[in-house]
Amino acid sequence: MNSPNQNPRPIVIALGGNALLQRGQPPEVEIQKANIHIAALAIAKVARHYPVVVTHGNGPQVGLLALQGECEKSCKPYPLDVLGAETEGMIGYLLEQELRNQLPGRDVVTLLTQIVVDRQDPAFLQPTKPIGPVYTLEQAQQLAQERGWAIAADGQDYRRVVASPEPQRIIELPTIQLLVNSGALVVCAGGGGIPVVVNEAGGLQGVEAVIDKDLAAALLAENLQAQGLLLLTDIDGVYENWGTNYAHRFEQTTPKNLRRYRFATGSIGPKVEAACRFVETTGQWCGIGKLDQALDIIDGKAGTVVMP
């Protein structure tokens, strides 16, 4: 991997939703602030050595806003694209503030980001993206019946799932590139970006969906010609035979090797797919691992590093 002096192109860092709100934690602002403080410390360590662009998850937050909206009977619930924009602004604000505190004198910019999807994407007919809090099976079944939700298992719990179409084009890409070139640390494409389609008049129109943040991060990194992609989560890498006595972490591997295995669709699977796409398309590296090991992952000393 190149040093910042040799390669001024950015590293794109994608924060997992657990970096903002850990499983089982109440979604209170003070708790999220504390988690974001920890995340900002890790990002700042990288940003002192490399140009950085940050993306983040929003699953718990967008689900909470959806629940709050359904409790307000005086107006119709807001659609998911609007809720996604709200969370992108909220989380971006908290991240930007913490990063400015950690990197005094550094320009940090949060940018709402629209990402075009295909209105004919089959994902609209088969919801797979978990959002909101976790439920027991009984609770989830009751909510599905009352509110018309699709539900799916998420580990030992259950969550609401919504459509997650493939990201195709980033509307604000030229602006993001301009900000990166200026030396700013950019927070963008939060929660996978705001899903939009091109309507018959050639304009943009929001759609009810949540784009996978890791696939959006891979597209962003490819478009920015990033020197690397860093997918940070709460586990220390990608494992073969995860959850068994024969679990083995891939330290350095290739897309070809990873595609021989099946990974959980609701957790590590999207990260593996995003890593493979980015490496196959660009010939650059992608690291997957724990937030507090970010620099070690870049140096090949921790996590799973996917190489061409």
Short names for language-model regions:
Residues N2-P308:
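C-terminal catalytic "cap/lid" subdomain
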